[in-house]
Amino acid sequence: LGDEGAKVLADYLKTDEKITTINLNACSIGDEGARAIAEALKTNTTITSLEMNNNMVDYEGSGALAQAFAQNSTVELLALSGNYVGALGAAALGAALKENTGLRSLQLNGNDIGNEGCIKLCEGLAARKDKINNLDLGNNSIGPEAGPALRDYLKNDDALTHLNLYMNELANDGCAAVAESLKDNKKIELLDIGGNNIGAFGAEKLAEALRDNDSLVTLELGYNPIGVPGGKALAETVKFHGKLNTMRMGWCKIGKEGGFAFADAIKYSSSLAVLDLRGNDLGDDGVALLEKPKKKKKKEK
């Protein structure tokens, strides 16, 4: 499609009153095409979903879209994953979203927004009266420096149910900040914090927070070196606290001891239905112990 095709489409959308969903994923659209689409959004009142994933939209294009969203309150889903939004584009979106009342889902996976972009975006989202319920910031080079901004935003948010922070660099301090917010946030149902270089300390803080949280249903922690201490802490929490249904902890280095802890936990947990412990070197003994509770439950039916 390219920029020229996007311009033609944008001209049509300025007056169209029927189309509600636009999918422009992987269409080789750059800043010019994004600017044209942005202009159309300023007057269009029927589009509710705009997907422009995996294009070539840089700061200028994302900035133009941000300006449009300061005026448009019809679009509920904006997907810009796999572009070049960067910190400046994220900051522009954050500022625009303070004025926007319609957006409910924002997907910015893989845009290298970094700490500064994340901070500005969180500030904008926190200032909104009408909150979003789905936020994807995975693979964005977000480090522990952005942890306080994430914490402050999440602490006071009463609408977000899905948060994706997969493949960033939050590490222990960033994880601890997010964990702290879970003590107050009673809405998040899915948290993906996998691949963030989180160790035992971060896992322990997360386990502590989950004791006071009854909303989280799915937790993705895979590819974090939480080790045996982190695994044990989470297993102890899962045993009697929270309502986790799905827990994914593949390749977390919890070893046999961590496996034993989870084998004990699932005997008592009344909510856990899916437990992913792939790549944790559980060994035959660890796997055997995990199998025993399953067999026991079958006999009790």
Region spans (language model):
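Leucine-rich tandem repeat or coiled-coil scaffolds
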Residues: 1-301
